[in-house]
């Protein structure tokens, strides 16, 4: 038997999000999104955790009140809306065979509440997909990547409300019916588990705007459950409308190491990993796992799934799984009740065996191999690595060039570990 490696047809590409690249926030019939009110933060004020981009109702209203004063970078992105042809040509020049991108919900339904979609927005993505296929590039489309129609956030507090599930279903049906002949691979939500740490970014729900007066813990998991239900409904719609297409999930994969060989640290590691697996188990197995029951009881968190919801979760299982991977973390037991370690740099900075990025995130290529083996062993589904990369402080030389050797070495090291995972027997079909 020959040595396993990247198989023929392996998908090589890159990833973007509509709110990061499109710009044209007030063109083509697009409505305002929550991300259009995220203010510019100077480099010396930025933090490597979610506090930099978490939006509250108070901060949103303050930004709206001073709209003429602040800079809102996501309104302009890199102007992909007007330069998608040049951008996709550059992707082809680099050898891309896949382009992970997202559709802006507010470009299709400007407020989220319209009965009929915005044809100009639909036509824009037709042109983008056609341009991709012109170069033999397969679009891999994220349905919702952190940008919501603003009224959905203000009136419904995002996925706190079940009405948002209904609006999302309408949006999903519209885009899948429109593009099912042009898009083979779909992802429902980007990094759905980040709702545990950056609720508004992931779900459109602001912690200080609960319409039901829920405390933060209850609000978070009510939102999580509504998003998981919406994800299942989206998968079901893809299967009904486009049985030839594949619908996947996308989670920020956490890799945790016990801080010591103390048994309690391993117990904490299991708890931390279970909070990550919770999202995979529901989306890949269609079951609501037992292992958070004690945590919910300790926190007095109620799970409001009906029998119909449980059936929907069973029916809406993903065809493949995907994830982002940026660093590994350390689990250290702090007593009962256990607390989620999270993804903040404080937890990744403590590993003496790893180097750190300029942002204090651990550089751990072997952790990617570990992640791939963990997920394939547990679920047996094909895997697409939706994101990995590194943030660096960079500067141009006198010839206006950036010498990217550090990033080249970073990517090379991670690709080698992907190859090792494939040798291990993991079915990885793209990155």
Language-model-detected regions and their locations in the chain:
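Active-site region of glycoside hydrolase catalytic domains
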Residues: 2-68, 111-113, 122-430
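Internal amphipathic alpha-helical repeat/solenoid segments
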Residues: 77-89, 110, 121
